[in-house]
Amino acid sequence: MNEIDLKERLKKFRVGISVCMGLAVAVCGVSYYFNSSGKFVSNFTESMPKGYYSIVERNPVNVTNEEIVTFCPDHTVYFSEAFTRRYIKQGGEKEACWVTPLLKVVGAKAGDHVHADENGIVVNGVLLAHSGSQPKDGNGQEMKIWRFDGIVPEGKVVLVNPMDLSFDSRYFGLVDTKQIREKVVPFWTWG
């Protein structure tokens, strides 16, 4: 290899490194904007597609099935145990919630007939996809499975996710609509 080839390869290498560094800075900037603008929520868990979700309504009065929402669960014994098991993460001032708000899909609302057991959640006669319960978590600990057969009462919803291993109403049951913080739609998601 002659000196000219080596200089040319070194020049291309430096350009490549510069481009990669520029892209990394841009990605960090975009990520910072999404998380600090107050217009987006991010998800990097396995329970929903990873990425950014645009907030379309804060403190919604009404939610309908299949809408995506965030909620801050009440600080109950069950959610405290979920926190200890690391199913949910600690929140902070930014979140104004004792845990990081959870991102879920409305599976059933007030007035819907729901049957829930280890085989899944059936809403108005239709079995929800990925709603079968797991008897144990990834660490081999037993999961409390929600059982219900009746009409969802006013002010309550069933929250689910499109993933088999999601921590959702299969385990914690009905959620008070007052705990719902935002309606969101996918903005930039993957996986």
Question: Where are the regions that the model predicts?
Answer:
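Mid-length scaffold segments of soluble, non-membrane domains
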Residues: 96-130
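Solvent-exposed loop/turn segments at secondary-structure junctions
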Residues: 77, 114, 121, 165-166
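Acidic/glycine-rich C-terminal interaction modules and beta/coil loop segments
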Residues: 131-184, 188-191
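Short, surface-exposed secondary-structure boundary micro-motifs
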Residues: 58, 74, 119, 162-163
